[in-house]
Amino acid sequence: MTQFEGFTNLYQVSKTLRFELIPQGKTLKHIQEQGFIEEDKARNDHYKELKPIIDRIYKTYADQCLQLVQLDWENLSAAIDSYRKEKTEETRNALIEEQATYRNAIHDYFIGRTDNLTDAINKRHAEIYKGLFKAELFNGKVLKQLGTVTTTEHENALLRSFDKFTTYFSGFYENRKNVFSAEDISTAIPHRIVQDNFPKFKENCHIFTRLITAVPSLREHFENVKKAIGIFVSTSIEEVFSFPFYNQLLTQTQIDLYNQLLGGISREAGTEKIKGLNEVLNLAIQKNDETAHIIASLPHRFIPLFKQILSDRNTLSFILEEFKSDEEVIQSFCKYKTLLRNENVLETAEALFNELNSIDLTHIFISHKKLETISSALCDHWDTLRNALYERRISELTGKITKSAKEKVQRSLKHEDINLQEIISAAGKELSEAFKQKTSEILSHAHAALDQPLPTTLKKQEEKEILKSQLDSLLGLYHLLDWFAVDESNEVDPEFSARLTGIKLEMEPSLSFYNKARNYATKKPYSVEKFKLNFQMPTLASGWDVNKEKNNGAILFVKNGLYYLGIMPKQKGRYKALSFEPTEKTSEGFDKMYYDYFPDAAKMIPKCSTQLKAVTAHFQTHTTPILLSNNFIEPLEITKEIYDLNNPEKEPKKFQTAYAKKTGDQKGYREALCKWIDFTRDFLSKYTKTTSIDLSSLRPSSQYKDLGEYYAELNPLLYHISFQRIAEKEIMDAVETGKLYLFQIYNKDFAKGHHGKPNLHTLYWTGLFSPENLAKTSIKLNGQAELFYRPKSRMKRMAHRLGEKMLNKKLKDQKTPIPDTLYQELYDYVNHRLSHDLSDEARALLPNVITKEVSHEIIKDRRFTSDKFFFHVPITLNYQAANSPSKFNQRVNAYLKEHPETPIIGIDRGERNLIYITVIDSTGKILEQRSLNTIQQFDYQKKLDNREKERVAARQAWSVVGTIKDLKQGYLSQVIHEIVDLMIHYQAVVVLENLNFGFKSKRTGIAEKAVYQQFEKMLIDKLNCLVLKDYPAEKVGGVLNPYQLTDQFTSFAKMGTQSGFLFYVPAPYTSKIDPLTGFVDPFVWKTIKNHESRKHFLEGFDFLHYDVKTGDFILHFKMNRNLSFQRGLPGFMPAWDIVFEKNETQFDAKGTPFIAGKRIVPVIENHRFTGRYRDLYPANELIALLEEKGIVFRDGSNILPKLLENDDSHAIDTMVALIRSVLQMRNSNAATGEDYINSPVRDLNGVCFDSRFQNPEWPMDADANGAYHIALKGQLLLNHLKESKDLKLQNGISNQDWLAYIQELRN
């Protein structure tokens, strides 16, 4: 018995299996003759055509609701003011809460739940809102209820055509529900009203009040503008700029009118424009009189409101949904460039950025979301600005600087936008100059893009590059503008904000255009797009029940170990199930599946008995029993007592546990429970659909403690599959005459002569129909299956022809992949097609390539050269288990308490290694450690690195992009297989670093957050239902009894620190830590930034002396000194000796030499990292410094005072740099392949740890060190668990816990 044996059959898991369908006999001919494929293709096209029509309906409904909104906006205004006045967590949280209140209030109008409307209107809204996402949207009911939507006959026909096919819109529904959502979603109408437009309107009210207070005569000018435009005629100008009026500015129509008031109305050419308020103010300022000076001294530009969600921009109709030709791309871009020129967008942007020299930068804000992007662009490092701002805010704190205060500053930088003045003050004037240079450069490139001509086609690479270069330049300006896109709750300069909004609105299409043009230019020659098949049946394959075959039209067959799908099309316009005559099993034929299912007894039994309308009507006037005979093989009696049990006057029902708890009437509860269970059994024995079900395995009614326990045993019995043999001739005759469309359900495992392990989809599918599963259901076949069709791609046929040579993708070592950029060159060379000399890089690989003669024609991407049918079918695994797990983590934790010897697998996403794994036992001893760069003799790390470089180059050049997604997906699958094997082999838990705890994206491979999170999700999903292919089906771990080692996944946010046997620990201090002592570098080096701080830093050490015996230098310090330069690491040892190891030659276990104490440091030139590294020997450098300064050291005396006595800046700066390099434990250089850990402190045996010794009892390199300490953090987590009384992990691991634990363990 394995220790994990208790972790099976704990909860249900749903999966969708995917297969190809191969038409049999005359199936394809009949389908083509009936035109079903063309019909469903048209329906798929109509689906796309309908989306904007449906959006018009949604917009109409939104407008109708928004016209009724009446809210008091004072509380939201006050919350914004409080936050602007004092930006604290309290005021931010208060604002967030107030925004949520207003969003919910608007949402209530949509769903008919507001107190501001009558019951009748609320009821109407509730009904329409539900209908917007159901068949009522298509059958005309919603249109009739709305009354104001104008649709053409063609549009009405399109809508009606989906009356029975509404499932097409399931995903679209979810997306559009977000438009009406009260959640904080930027694409939701409530968000647009509350968080985008109200702050603008509020600012406009403030501007208006200040202007007419300072210059009362403006009131009349403003009123005249309103009259001239002819809007809001019954409302005074003061009312327009008051909060109650905002209720009238929620629809796009009203927003347009308001924006016309601010910006005026352009009329036909030759006709004077009707001026808006902003132009009136500009003209007033141009008079240069006293009034002009007053106006100019105040905020004097009103801010237009954003368009409402779902509103159209007709001016940009030339940007198509998808480009299909070179001409479409070029013509569209020409029109866009013309638009930008005509609107003087670039000139306006230039003027806007020039004005930053003369306005108050405390009211110009940078988005906190863009801080890292801006830092990379202006400072060459992503965290420079964040660090500078952090230091500035810390320096401004008064009193004791606590850990809590530091965390508060960190949170503020993470969640709050920052004004430009603070950024410049923190980072220095150099930043201001860098910003000016960057904006000038971006605008210059954008101007050049508008002036340059476009190519006439995009056939050649250089033509694509011309288009891309121009789009890059415009996109650069858009991204620059996006730096300033901030929450309007900031006290933003209204002038700047108004103009920025206008420019950004004009530049916004450049992003959409860029993506669509790039997708067109880089698309593959083949298409993976498929569309759904219905065969004129709206519910095709929605279920398999034998009684519903007529409606669902789908049946399954088995013959000689192969599986077939049958589709029964309409006959003469009518649905008709085929009637097959069963025959003897001994005769040749197909075994037809007969599927019986009575779903969810708790719901369906009452629905078919006590809750029937006739039963309810009977007991409203009678107390005598009623007999039901329709759908029953013999009459079912329902007594008044049984009826009342399920229809009590007051809840809870008497047979529910809630009744016993509420009343204490245990006896009455038990009697009612038994009576109801007896009734359900009586029902099932008489109901036509369920009479054949064997209920003999159920216990007597009195033995069930509650209804849930009873239904849990009953429901699995209500599902049953059986097979009957049908003569082959009968089936094939039906296929021949077109009454049955027959497809083989296919994947490569069903290919003739296939050998090897079947994939999981095959295992699930064959397991589903296995005798063991038919006898006791573990895998259930579900409804809602779908059929798809993918037309063949129109592409140039590429083939390896007979007599040619094929080139292996790997070299002779069967490990190293050939880079794609060299593969084609080598392939052409071995086939004598290369028109130039072989490159040096390719020639170096030539001796190690593997070639093979082509014995038959091999077509590239063959699967896309023919039409394909596909079948997606859902199943449920562990069908007899609960829908969801109960206290899964506590169950695991109880197991771990009983098995303290459980090993731990630590997993690190490395720097040089994609994934590194270390397995330790319960004492911390390393059992196994290895990199997963290479799996099954394939170097994924090199392949991914090559593919990433090729992909970047292709993206930059807009050439066809080689996919990296599939490569990463394949690698992740291999990694998970390796981890699972280790987990089962060692019966171990797995420990990962916590993504949500200060995650930093690394450079390549799978280290970026999205891919690493995908890896985690794949691992959780795999362990949700772990099937080991080699195991017998019913054995633990087999397909009918899979392991379940992780909890059901909901979201990473809700998961916390544990999912079953998968644990999460914070990443800090796992990689750059000494495994022998637990020492980590305690200093914050960015705080040591000038001569004074460096001198003060050195004064904080006790002594520095030369060890005569070892040739090392020893720097001693106590943790209670130098506190201002430390990270604040409680739990640290009180004192340490930092060792400058003698730089002498040592040898590893294989006799390979290395220099002790060597450090690898970045090469810095002109204050910037060059991307190169160099070797540094700190002890030798220190000796050279001391000899240069004439300081005697070989007597072992304290030399620190001598370094400090003359305030020699060179000596002090060099000494600080050497200390920093010595404390750098991790040393890596990709160019040389070095990556090691070398500790600067000795352990109890006097040894400075160095991974270069390659001792297998300790981490073998830097990434191994990370995985090892992640595993040790897991050990600490399990120790916490052992001390837990409630089997819960109350807290994670703090840095204090961790360092105290590891240092106590080692010292």
Swiss-Prot record:
Primary gene name: cas12a
Residues at which crRNA binds: 47-51, 175-176, 307-310, 752-761, 806-808
The organism of origin for this protein: Acidaminococcus sp. (strain BV3L6)
Site feature (Binds sequence-specific recognition of both target and non-target strand bases in PAM) residues: K607
Name of the protein in question: CRISPR-associated endonuclease Cas12a
An example molecular function term from Gene Ontology annotations: lyase activity
Uses in biotechnology: This class of CRISPR enzymes recognize a 5' T-rich protospacer adjacent motif (PAM, TTTN for this specific enzyme), unlike Cas9 enzymes which recognize 3' G-rich PAMs, thus this enzyme increases the possibilites for genome editing. When appropriately expressed in a human cell line mediates human genome editing via indel formation; its T-rich PAM sequence may make it useful for engineering of AT-rich genomes or of regions such as scaffold-matrix attachment areas. It has also been engineered to recognize altered PAM sequences, which will enlarge its target scope.
Result after altering R176A: Decreased guided indel formation
Record text on subunit structure and interactions: Monomer.
Lineage per the UniProt record: Bacteria, Bacillati, Bacillota, Negativicutes, Acidaminococcales
Chain segments carrying region Nuclease domain: 1067-1262
Co-factor requirement: Mg(2+)
